[in-house]
Amino acid sequence: MKKNYLLYFLLLALSTPIWVSCNDWTESEAKDYFEGPSEEYYAALRAYKKSDHPKAFGWFGNWTGEGASLVNSMAGIPDSVDVVSIWGNWSNITEAQKKDLKFCQEVKGTRFTMCFIITSVGTQITPQHIYDNWESMGFASQQEAVNDFWGWPSDESDKEAVEASIRKYANAIADTINKYGYDGFDIDYEPNYGNKGNIVDDDDRMFIFVDELGKHFGPKSGTGKLLIIDGEPQSIKNRPDVGPYFDYFIIQAYKPGNDNNLDKRLIDGGVAGPGLVQTYGSVMSEEQITKMT
């Protein structure tokens, strides 16, 4: 009998801590054990991004600022990235997007530019009601309604009207960027890859467009906001004086194959038109162009 009591107490002693432990394991309230980066870390990160160093750049699409995963949030972009161009979803942003943007700008020191392909006056920012109501507004075509909204003349030999229309469009882009609190504009310039239009088909008109943007963004503006050109910046061959308006040149070079191919795009061309240095070398030094690229 004593043996049975001894066995009973021994089993009770063994089972008690197990029961207590299991009770701890099954607590219904979730605990967050993650400790985020310290303020010292973020301060050092912001200081690094303000320093003179090779810049990390990328495009970011499908931005929502929401979800359990950070795949659609700017907060999920690696901390070391300096500048991000927003590809799509940059208009009518939600509160979640505003919060996401503000955190990355103010805490991480990352800079965000609006980006889209430039072709003609009105691209991307013509009010939707113009496209929806052009017939009821009495226009013969949708394009005629767009041209009327921006003041684009039917007679393109009217250079003053053409210039006024281009500058109106550039200012509307600037207003949009400032409205959302972005850090500048990234011009996606690809006229030799099917993206034709009444601005990009003419280097003088392209200069007018950049000149007006340059009052708001880029090194000539004094605002500290960025003006970037990506795609084919080397192709504005007839207006090299446009080069100093930009903070950065970004050459799109998909599947270049080797370093020599990249060098040609930068220096002496023969791969995708002229090299950057060939285009802008008369107004900028090779060192300056290289550092901006």
Name the predicted role of every residue range.
Residues 1-6, 11-51:
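Bacterial Sec-dependent N-terminal signal peptides
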